[in-house]
Amino acid sequence: MRPELALVPGEPAGIGPELCVRLVQQPREDCRLLAFADPDTLRAAAAALNLPLQLLPEGAEARVPGDLRLRVVANATPSRFGQADPANAGAVIGALLGAGQACLSGELHGVVTGPVHKAVINEGGIAYSGTTELLADQAGVKVVMMLANHIVRVALATTHLPLREVADAITAPSLEHTLRTVHAALRREFGLPAPRIAVLGLNPHAGEDGHLGREELDLVIPLLQRLRAEGMDLIGPLPADTAFLPAKLAGFDTVLAMYHDQGLPVLKYSGFEQAVNLTLGLPYPRVAVDHGTALDLAGRGVADPSSLQAATTLCAQLARQRTLSA
Protein backbone atom coordinates (compact mmCIF):
# COMPACT_ATOMS: atom_id res chain seq x y z
CA MET A 1 0.00 0.00 0.00
CA ARG A 2 1.31 3.42 -0.99
CA PRO A 3 -0.46 5.93 1.25
CA GLU A 4 -1.69 9.32 0.08
CA LEU A 5 -0.43 12.04 2.43
CA ALA A 6 -1.30 15.71 2.77
CA LEU A 7 1.72 18.01 2.98
CA VAL A 8 1.06 21.38 4.67
CA PRO A 9 4.00 23.84 4.68
CA GLY A 10 2.68 25.96 7.58
CA GLU A 11 3.66 29.62 7.94
CA PRO A 12 4.26 30.91 4.38
CA ALA A 13 6.92 33.42 5.45
CA GLY A 14 8.94 30.82 7.35
CA ILE A 15 11.08 27.90 6.31
CA GLY A 16 8.19 25.48 5.75
CA PRO A 17 7.73 26.14 2.01
CA GLU A 18 11.42 25.73 1.20
CA LEU A 19 11.59 22.54 3.25
CA CYS A 20 8.73 21.18 1.15
CA VAL A 21 10.62 22.09 -2.01
CA ARG A 22 13.69 20.25 -0.72
CA LEU A 23 11.55 17.27 0.26
CA VAL A 24 10.34 16.65 -3.29
CA GLN A 25 13.78 16.77 -4.91
CA GLN A 26 13.83 12.99 -4.53
CA PRO A 27 10.72 11.21 -5.88
CA ARG A 28 9.22 9.07 -3.12
CA GLU A 29 8.19 5.45 -3.42
CA ASP A 30 6.80 5.15 0.12
CA CYS A 31 3.90 7.60 -0.37
CA ARG A 32 2.18 10.07 -2.70
CA LEU A 33 2.20 13.69 -1.51
CA LEU A 34 -0.49 16.29 -2.06
CA ALA A 35 0.46 19.80 -0.94
CA PHE A 36 -2.18 22.12 0.53
CA ALA A 37 -0.50 25.44 -0.15
CA ASP A 38 -0.25 28.71 -2.03
CA PRO A 39 1.46 28.09 -5.40
CA ASP A 40 3.26 31.43 -5.57
CA THR A 41 4.79 30.83 -2.14
CA LEU A 42 6.15 27.45 -3.21
CA ARG A 43 7.51 28.86 -6.46
CA ALA A 44 9.26 31.69 -4.62
CA ALA A 45 10.86 29.18 -2.25
CA ALA A 46 12.08 27.06 -5.16
CA ALA A 47 13.53 30.12 -6.89
CA ALA A 48 15.35 31.18 -3.73
CA LEU A 49 16.91 27.73 -3.47
CA ASN A 50 17.56 27.49 -7.22
CA LEU A 51 15.80 24.13 -7.25
CA PRO A 52 13.30 22.73 -9.75
CA LEU A 53 9.61 22.73 -8.87
CA GLN A 54 6.76 21.54 -11.07
CA LEU A 55 3.34 21.98 -9.49
CA LEU A 56 1.07 19.24 -10.80
CA PRO A 57 -2.69 18.69 -10.85
CA GLU A 58 -4.02 16.51 -8.06
CA GLY A 59 -4.53 13.52 -10.33
CA ALA A 60 -1.02 13.57 -11.78
CA GLU A 61 1.93 11.44 -10.71
CA ALA A 62 5.20 12.85 -9.35
CA ARG A 63 7.95 11.29 -11.45
CA VAL A 64 10.98 13.58 -11.54
CA PRO A 65 12.80 15.74 -8.97
CA GLY A 66 10.69 18.77 -8.10
CA ASP A 67 7.30 17.30 -9.00
CA LEU A 68 4.64 18.14 -6.41
CA ARG A 69 0.89 17.65 -6.68
CA LEU A 70 -1.01 20.68 -5.37
CA ARG A 71 -4.40 21.58 -3.95
CA VAL A 72 -4.43 25.36 -4.02
CA VAL A 73 -4.98 27.25 -0.76
CA ALA A 74 -4.29 30.82 -1.79
CA ASN A 75 -2.79 33.40 0.54
CA ALA A 76 -4.66 36.66 1.07
CA THR A 77 -1.49 38.65 0.39
CA PRO A 78 1.85 37.71 -1.21
CA SER A 79 4.22 36.25 1.38
CA ARG A 80 7.72 37.58 1.92
CA PHE A 81 10.56 35.61 3.47
CA GLY A 82 10.86 36.36 7.16
CA GLN A 83 7.88 38.75 7.27
CA ALA A 84 4.89 36.88 8.65
CA ASP A 85 1.60 38.57 7.76
CA PRO A 86 -1.49 38.02 9.96
CA ALA A 87 -3.60 38.54 6.83
CA ASN A 88 -2.52 35.04 5.74
CA ALA A 89 -3.66 33.37 8.96
CA GLY A 90 -6.86 32.19 7.29
CA ALA A 91 -4.91 30.46 4.53
CA VAL A 92 -2.66 28.68 7.03
CA ILE A 93 -5.63 27.41 9.03
CA GLY A 94 -7.56 26.60 5.87
CA ALA A 95 -4.73 24.40 4.61
CA LEU A 96 -4.57 22.51 7.90
CA LEU A 97 -8.33 22.00 8.11
CA GLY A 98 -8.51 21.04 4.44
CA ALA A 99 -5.86 18.39 4.95
CA GLY A 100 -7.59 17.10 8.06
CA GLN A 101 -10.96 16.92 6.32
CA ALA A 102 -9.45 15.04 3.39
CA CYS A 103 -8.27 12.40 5.85
CA LEU A 104 -11.55 12.28 7.74
CA SER A 105 -13.39 11.67 4.46
CA GLY A 106 -11.04 8.83 3.53
CA GLU A 107 -9.57 10.65 0.53
CA LEU A 108 -6.10 10.79 2.11
CA HIS A 109 -4.38 8.60 4.68
CA GLY A 110 -2.29 11.01 6.78
CA VAL A 111 -1.06 14.56 7.28
CA VAL A 112 2.49 15.94 7.45
CA THR A 113 2.68 19.50 8.73
CA GLY A 114 5.35 22.18 8.74
CA PRO A 115 5.81 24.83 11.44
CA VAL A 116 3.05 27.33 12.25
CA HIS A 117 3.53 30.68 14.02
CA LYS A 118 0.93 30.72 16.81
CA ALA A 119 1.19 34.43 17.56
CA VAL A 120 0.67 35.42 13.92
CA ILE A 121 -2.44 33.24 13.65
CA ASN A 122 -3.93 34.85 16.74
CA GLU A 123 -2.99 38.32 15.49
CA GLY A 124 -4.97 37.45 12.38
CA GLY A 125 -8.10 37.14 14.51
CA ILE A 126 -8.21 33.34 14.75
CA ALA A 127 -8.11 31.74 18.20
CA TYR A 128 -5.39 29.11 17.83
CA SER A 129 -3.44 27.21 20.46
CA GLY A 130 -1.76 24.71 18.16
CA THR A 131 -2.26 22.37 15.23
CA THR A 132 -2.66 19.42 17.58
CA GLU A 133 -5.67 21.07 19.21
CA LEU A 134 -7.05 22.33 15.88
CA LEU A 135 -7.14 18.89 14.28
CA ALA A 136 -8.46 17.28 17.46
CA ASP A 137 -11.37 19.74 17.57
CA GLN A 138 -12.11 19.13 13.90
CA ALA A 139 -12.22 15.36 14.43
CA GLY A 140 -14.11 15.63 17.73
CA VAL A 141 -11.58 13.56 19.68
CA LYS A 142 -9.18 13.92 22.58
CA VAL A 143 -5.56 13.44 21.60
CA VAL A 144 -2.11 12.95 23.07
CA MET A 145 1.08 14.65 21.95
CA MET A 146 4.11 12.43 21.39
CA LEU A 147 7.56 13.45 20.22
CA ALA A 148 10.02 10.96 18.85
CA ASN A 149 13.43 10.57 17.30
CA HIS A 150 15.61 7.57 16.47
CA ILE A 151 16.41 7.04 20.17
CA VAL A 152 13.28 7.62 22.25
CA ARG A 153 9.54 8.29 22.11
CA VAL A 154 8.08 10.66 24.71
CA ALA A 155 4.34 11.14 25.20
CA LEU A 156 2.97 13.95 27.36
CA ALA A 157 0.28 13.81 30.04
CA THR A 158 -0.03 17.60 29.78
CA THR A 159 1.22 19.91 27.05
CA HIS A 160 1.46 23.70 26.99
CA LEU A 161 0.55 24.62 30.56
CA PRO A 162 2.22 26.91 33.09
CA LEU A 163 4.08 24.74 35.57
CA ARG A 164 1.91 25.87 38.48
CA GLU A 165 -1.16 24.40 36.71
CA VAL A 166 0.29 21.00 35.86
CA ALA A 167 -0.52 19.11 39.06
CA ASP A 168 -4.17 20.17 38.98
CA ALA A 169 -4.46 19.15 35.32
CA ILE A 170 -3.35 15.57 36.01
CA THR A 171 -6.41 13.66 37.15
CA ALA A 172 -7.13 9.95 37.19
CA PRO A 173 -9.52 10.18 34.20
CA SER A 174 -7.14 12.34 32.14
CA LEU A 175 -4.13 10.15 32.88
CA GLU A 176 -6.10 7.00 32.12
CA HIS A 177 -7.19 8.44 28.78
CA THR A 178 -3.61 9.36 27.95
CA LEU A 179 -2.29 5.90 28.76
CA ARG A 180 -5.04 4.15 26.83
CA THR A 181 -4.48 6.40 23.82
CA VAL A 182 -0.72 5.83 23.84
CA HIS A 183 -1.13 2.08 24.32
CA ALA A 184 -3.64 1.81 21.47
CA ALA A 185 -1.49 3.88 19.11
CA LEU A 186 1.63 1.84 19.81
CA ARG A 187 -0.28 -1.31 18.94
CA ARG A 188 -2.23 -0.04 15.94
CA GLU A 189 0.22 2.36 14.29
CA PHE A 190 3.62 1.16 15.47
CA GLY A 191 2.79 -2.54 15.28
CA LEU A 192 3.84 -3.32 18.86
CA PRO A 193 1.56 -6.10 20.17
CA ALA A 194 2.50 -5.61 23.85
CA PRO A 195 4.06 -2.15 24.28
CA ARG A 196 6.03 -1.30 27.43
CA ILE A 197 5.31 2.20 28.68
CA ALA A 198 7.47 3.87 31.32
CA VAL A 199 5.49 6.36 33.39
CA LEU A 200 7.40 9.19 35.07
CA GLY A 201 6.46 10.52 38.46
CA LEU A 202 5.22 14.07 38.76
CA ASN A 203 7.42 14.99 41.72
CA PRO A 204 11.20 14.76 42.26
CA HIS A 205 12.25 11.16 42.99
CA ALA A 206 8.68 10.14 42.06
CA GLY A 207 7.46 11.60 45.34
CA GLU A 208 9.94 9.83 47.65
CA ASP A 209 7.19 7.71 49.28
CA GLY A 210 5.03 10.77 49.82
CA HIS A 211 7.70 13.00 51.34
CA LEU A 212 7.99 15.11 48.17
CA GLY A 213 4.34 15.07 47.12
CA ARG A 214 1.48 12.58 47.23
CA GLU A 215 0.34 12.51 43.60
CA GLU A 216 2.22 9.27 42.97
CA LEU A 217 0.73 7.50 46.01
CA ASP A 218 -2.79 8.86 45.71
CA LEU A 219 -3.29 8.92 41.94
CA VAL A 220 -0.58 7.43 39.74
CA ILE A 221 0.17 4.14 41.50
CA PRO A 222 -3.49 3.08 41.97
CA LEU A 223 -4.22 3.83 38.31
CA LEU A 224 -1.20 1.91 37.06
CA GLN A 225 -2.15 -1.07 39.22
CA ARG A 226 -5.66 -1.09 37.76
CA LEU A 227 -4.46 -0.86 34.17
CA ARG A 228 -1.82 -3.54 34.74
CA ALA A 229 -4.62 -5.84 35.86
CA GLU A 230 -6.15 -5.33 32.40
CA GLY A 231 -2.91 -6.43 30.76
CA MET A 232 -1.06 -3.19 30.08
CA ASP A 233 2.71 -3.35 30.57
CA LEU A 234 3.34 -0.19 32.60
CA ILE A 235 6.55 0.59 34.49
CA GLY A 236 6.64 3.22 37.19
CA PRO A 237 6.13 5.76 38.42
CA LEU A 238 9.83 6.34 37.80
CA PRO A 239 12.04 9.23 38.93
CA ALA A 240 12.49 11.41 35.86
CA ASP A 241 16.16 12.13 36.52
CA THR A 242 17.22 8.52 35.92
CA ALA A 243 14.50 7.16 33.61
CA PHE A 244 16.30 8.33 30.48
CA LEU A 245 19.54 6.48 31.13
CA PRO A 246 20.35 4.43 28.01
CA ALA A 247 20.25 1.11 29.86
CA LYS A 248 16.73 1.85 31.06
CA LEU A 249 15.45 3.29 27.79
CA ALA A 250 16.38 0.06 26.06
CA GLY A 251 13.59 -1.66 27.98
CA PHE A 252 10.82 0.82 27.10
CA ASP A 253 8.83 1.41 23.94
CA THR A 254 7.69 4.86 25.11
CA VAL A 255 8.13 7.19 28.07
CA LEU A 256 5.11 9.08 29.41
CA ALA A 257 6.23 12.41 30.90
CA MET A 258 3.90 14.35 33.15
CA TYR A 259 4.69 17.74 31.66
CA HIS A 260 6.37 19.37 28.69
CA ASP A 261 9.79 20.24 30.07
CA GLN A 262 10.12 17.00 32.02
CA GLY A 263 10.52 14.83 28.95
CA LEU A 264 11.28 16.91 25.90
CA PRO A 265 14.69 18.39 26.77
CA VAL A 266 16.20 14.90 26.83
CA LEU A 267 14.62 13.98 23.52
CA LYS A 268 15.76 17.16 21.81
CA TYR A 269 19.27 16.87 23.20
CA SER A 270 19.55 13.30 21.96
CA GLY A 271 18.61 14.15 18.37
CA PHE A 272 16.83 17.43 17.67
CA GLU A 273 17.35 17.33 13.90
CA GLN A 274 15.50 14.02 13.58
CA ALA A 275 12.77 14.79 16.12
CA VAL A 276 9.14 14.78 15.02
CA ASN A 277 5.82 15.57 16.69
CA LEU A 278 2.97 13.05 16.50
CA THR A 279 -0.69 13.48 17.37
CA LEU A 280 -2.06 10.24 18.82
CA GLY A 281 -5.79 9.59 18.93
CA LEU A 282 -6.81 11.10 15.58
CA PRO A 283 -8.56 8.83 13.06
CA TYR A 284 -5.47 9.21 10.86
CA PRO A 285 -1.72 9.67 11.46
CA ARG A 286 -0.49 13.24 11.76
CA VAL A 287 3.24 13.91 12.05
CA ALA A 288 4.83 17.35 12.24
CA VAL A 289 8.28 18.83 12.32
CA ASP A 290 9.64 19.53 15.78
CA HIS A 291 10.95 23.01 15.12
CA GLY A 292 9.61 26.50 14.61
CA THR A 293 9.07 28.75 11.63
CA ALA A 294 12.64 30.16 11.77
CA LEU A 295 11.66 33.42 10.11
CA ASP A 296 15.27 34.59 10.31
CA LEU A 297 16.41 31.69 8.12
CA ALA A 298 13.63 31.79 5.53
CA GLY A 299 14.77 32.14 1.93
CA ARG A 300 18.44 31.75 2.73
CA GLY A 301 18.72 28.10 1.77
CA VAL A 302 20.27 27.02 5.06
CA ALA A 303 17.28 25.41 6.81
CA ASP A 304 17.78 21.73 7.70
CA PRO A 305 15.11 19.50 6.09
CA SER A 306 15.86 16.48 8.30
CA SER A 307 12.81 16.83 10.55
CA LEU A 308 10.37 17.16 7.63
CA GLN A 309 11.99 14.21 5.90
CA ALA A 310 11.71 12.13 9.07
CA ALA A 311 8.10 13.24 9.60
CA THR A 312 7.12 12.24 6.06
CA THR A 313 8.81 8.85 6.28
CA LEU A 314 7.21 8.10 9.64
CA CYS A 315 3.75 9.26 8.56
CA ALA A 316 3.90 6.93 5.56
CA GLN A 317 4.95 4.05 7.82
CA LEU A 318 2.16 4.75 10.30
CA ALA A 319 -0.45 4.99 7.55
CA ARG A 320 0.61 1.62 6.14
CA GLN A 321 0.66 0.01 9.58
CA ARG A 322 -2.77 1.42 10.40
CA THR A 323 -4.14 -0.23 7.26
CA LEU A 324 -2.56 -3.56 8.22
CA SER A 325 -4.02 -3.32 11.72
CA ALA A 326 -7.53 -2.42 10.56
Curated annotation (Swiss-Prot):
GO terms for molecular function: 4-hydroxythreonine-4-phosphate dehydrogenase activity; cobalt ion binding; magnesium ion binding; NAD binding; zinc ion binding. One of its GO terms (cellular component) is cytoplasm. Pathway: Cofactor biosynthesis; pyridoxine 5'-phosphate biosynthesis; pyridoxine 5'-phosphate from D-erythrose 4-phosphate: step 4/5. It comes from the Bacteria. Keywords: Cobalt, Cytoplasm, Magnesium, Metal-binding, NAD, NADP, Oxidoreductase, Pyridoxine biosynthesis, Zinc. The keyword NADP applies. Its cofactor is Zn(2+); Mg(2+); Co(2+). Its EC number is 1.1.1.262. It is an enzyme of class 1 (oxidoreductase). InterPro entries: PdxA, PdxA_fam. GO terms for biological process: pyridoxal phosphate biosynthetic process; pyridoxine biosynthetic process. A divalent metal cation binds at H160, H205, H260. Its main location: cytoplasm. Catalyzes the NAD(P)-dependent oxidation of 4-(phosphooxy)-L-threonine (HTP) into 2-amino-3-oxo-4-(phosphooxy)butyric acid which spontaneously decarboxylates to form 3-amino-2-oxopropyl phosphate (AHAP). The active site is located at the dimer interface. HAMAP family: PdxA (MF_00536). This is 4-hydroxythreonine-4-phosphate dehydrogenase.
